[in-house]
Amino acid sequence: MPIISSFAKKLGFCLILLAGPFSFGLSTPLLAYPFATIVLDAATGEKLYGQNSNTKLHPASLTKMMTLYLTFREVEEGRLRLDQRVLISKNASREPPSKFGYKVGQKVSIRFLIRAAAIRSANDAATALGEAISGSEAEFANYMTRAARSMGMDSTTFKNANGLTASAHLSTARDMALLGRRLIYDFPEYYHLFGRSSVVSLGRTLYNTNRKFLASYSGADGIKTGFTSAAGFNLAASAKRGNKRVVAVVFGSGSVKLRTRRMTELLNIGFAKASSSSRQNRLPPLKLSKSDDLNDFES
């Protein structure tokens, strides 16, 4: 027994050494998932800190940020209306949880689908939005990937509208931070939705999957949680204090509690380093058509 105890202590000490400390005070648990972080100055786009931020990982429901971005774009450009009702397909109705629970043939307005996807992280709502925009989820995934390329998200490929694990459906912490920044500045009239603790959709109160973090971190007003067994617990977040706004992404946490702690540490780093200037570097217009060839962005 003493020999076993001594060996266990030595093994534990070696694992601690191998784990190593993160710089800037980030917590240091042994990692169950591939892990990545980044924090940007939202006004300038400057990277303030990051680990493995260009590593391709599973984005899980952070995917819905792009689904919603393109939905907002379709509404703004007049191709969709918020009160427009769309037919729920068999494909959308069969999506696994988390979901709203729409029935095949049910008609649901774009407004309510947006609320369910953004707040409840409903997979069926995200799929229905993609089908409403592009006719099929596969075509919409191609549209999402083209949009990613146009935004400079060079390491992202989408295969569905909701983020369920699929071969080659991958992104990076950097790319998702760029997308978060786009949501904030391209659609301020819709971005506020991500900061709400709850919404009503079809007579049901939907609670924000991110509400505990929003309540716990001063200035936090978004953006999106994500989880799958392949990804771990992901979070894209933004917060504003005074003239400073930062955007941060965490991939691969082992629990909600750990994700919250890491994001808190990351945003604190961001606010310590971000510029106090309120001047925002203008984002270039998104040049994108649903008919564009993906190869045009990869040449």
Regions found by a protein language model. Give the residues of each.
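Hydrophobic alpha-helical segments, especially transmembrane helices
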Residues: 10-11, 65, 241
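Active-site-adjacent loops and short helices of periplasmic peptidoglycan-processing enzymes
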Residues: 21, 25-174, 184
